[in-house]
């Protein structure tokens, strides 16, 4: 199961005692700020979590895996996330719920 923005807002309501409407708006504003920063080419560093960066990919030749036909893959910008050391350690040491 995936964690959603709604669930994040609900967790803020439970843990911090925020009003539900304020918690939802906080989550939306948080992600909007990350989007704006990435759109303008800025790196987003979240201490203890990881870094989001934007990279420019050059155009390159590719191949359609179904048909084997050669195709051109156009140049594009992509978002890259690199997990921080603390996050990597916590995920590595986490006990998986069955």
Curated annotation (Swiss-Prot):
One Pfam entry name: Bac_DNA_binding
A GO MF term: structural constituent of chromatin
InterPro entries, alphabetized: Hist_DNA-bd (IPR000119), Histone-like_DNA-bd_CS (IPR020816), IHF-like_DNA-bd_dom_sf (IPR010992), IHF_alpha (IPR005684)
GO BP annotations listed: DNA recombination; positive regulation of metabolic process; regulation of DNA-templated transcription; regulation of translation
Subunit structure: Heterodimer of an alpha and a beta chain.
Family: Belongs to the bacterial histone-like protein family.
PANTHER family: DNA-BINDING PROTEIN HU, INTEGRATION HOST FACTOR SUBUNIT ALPHA
Protein name: Integration host factor subunit alpha
Source organism per UniProt: Glaesserella parasuis serovar 5 (strain SH0165) (Haemophilus parasuis)
Annotated gene: ihfA
């Amino acid at each position: 199961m995936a964690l959603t923005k709604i669930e994040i807002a609900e967790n803020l309501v439970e843990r911090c005692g925020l009003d539900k409407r304020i918690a939802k708006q906080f989550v939306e504003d948080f992600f909007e700020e990350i989007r704006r920063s990435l759109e303008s080419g800025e790196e987003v560093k979240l201490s203890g979590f990881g870094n989001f960066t934007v990279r420019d990919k050059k155009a390159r030749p590719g191949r359609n895996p179904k048909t084997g036909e050669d195709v051109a893959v156009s140049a594009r910008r992509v978002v890259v996330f690199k997990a921080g050391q603390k996050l990597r350690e916590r995920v590595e040491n986490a006990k998986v719920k069955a």
